[in-house]
UniProtKB/Swiss-Prot annotation:
GO molecular function term, any single one: translation release factor activity, codon specific
UniProt modified residues of type N5-methylglutamine: Q230
Function: Peptide chain release factor 1 directs the termination of translation in response to the peptide chain termination codons UAG and UAA.
Origin organism lineage: Bacteria, Thermotogati, Deinococcota, Deinococci, Deinococcales
Species assigned in the record: Deinococcus deserti (strain DSM 17065 / CIP 109153 / LMG 22923 / VCD115)
Protein name: Peptide chain release factor 1
Family indicated by similarity: Belongs to the prokaryotic/mitochondrial release factor family.
HAMAP family referenced in this protein's UniProt entry, alphabetically: Rel_fac_1 (MF_00093)
Keyword terms, alphabetized: Cytoplasm, Methylation, Protein biosynthesis
Localization per record: Cytoplasm
Amino acid sequence: MSGRLSELAAEFGMVERALGDPAALADPQAYTRLTRRHRELLPLVTLLREREALESDLRGAQELLSDPDMRELAQNEITEATARLEQLGAELEVLLLPTDPDDLKNVILELRAGAGGAEAGLFVMDLLRMYTRYAEDRGLRLNVLEASESDLGGASKVVAEISGEFAFRAFKWERGVHRVQRVPATESQGRIHTSTVTVAVLPEAEQGEVQLDLSEVRIDVFRSQGAGGQGVNTTDSAVRAVYRAGTPDEIMVVCQDGRSQIKNREKALVVLASRLAERERAARDAQEARDRAAQVGSGERSEKIRTYNYPQNRVTDHRLEGDSKNHPLDSVMAGGLGPVVSALARDERERQLLAASAEEARDGAA
C-alpha cells in the first residue's frame, strides 16, 4: 500500500505544479481535467499529511518516555496517536479502492411511469420532488428538461439535469425500479395499490467524450407544451433531437425547458450524447459479463431496488440487509436520502475491500 500512496502523493504534487502554471489556462479541457484530479487526490493527500504529523509526534513522545516527569503525558500521547494511526490506515485503504470515474460528472435523470396507470404518474412527480430536495440539500441544481404531464398532476415521463460537484456519485444508486404501495386518492374502498416507476441515472457526456455525427441527427422545433397539451409560449422554442431516426438505433430527446431555441438545442444534444455514451457503456458491460460468464446484479435497470410503503411509513432498499435496509418514509420523501445512500456506499466499499483482500491472498499464494 505504501508504494501506491507514494505514487499518488507524487502525482498530486505534479498536478498542483501544473495548476500553478499560467499556461494551463490556455487549454480549458486540460485545466478541467487537472482540477478534477486535484479534487480526487486531495482527501488522500490530506490524510497522508495527517499521518506524517502523527508519526512525528509519536517519535517525540517516545523520546520523552525516559523522563519520569513526562512519562505519563507521553504515554497518553502515544496511546492516542497509535489509535488514530490505525484509523488512518483503514481510511487510506478505503481511498485506495477503485473509484468511479463518472462520480464528478453531472447527471441526466429520467423518471418513467411503469405499472399502475395514473397512480404511477403521480409517484413520478413525488420522486421528482424528493430528488429536488435531496439535490438542494447537497448543493446541487436540478433543472427539468422535459415533462410529459397529465391533468391529474402526474407525469408519464420526466427528464432532468442535475449539475454540481459529485452529482453522479450522489444519484447513481437511484437507477432501477422503484415500487410504491399506498391507497390512491381515487380509491373509495381503501385498498392498497402497487405501482412502479423506472429511474435511469446517466452521467452527462462531456465535450469530446462521444463523437456525435450531426448528419445522423434530425432536429425538429415546435412550441412548448404544458399539462394537458396547453401551449406555454407562442414561439417554436422546444427542440426534438432524433438520432438515426427510423432505425433500431433510434434515440429521441425532447428539450422544452428554456425559452431559447438555441439553448434547448444545445441541451438536447448533450442529453443525446449522454444516452449514446450510456448505450456504449452498457454494450461494453454486457460483453464483459459474457466474457467472465457472470451477471452482476447491481447494474441491471430492471431490478426492483426499493419499496415505498405508505401505510407503514417505511422505505425498504432491497440491496441492503439488516437494520440498514429500512428507513422512515416521511424523511426520505422530504429529501432525506442521505442515510440510504451512505448505507449503499458503505456496503459497496466493504465488498471492494473483501475483493481486494481476496486478490492479495491469491497473489500471496502464487
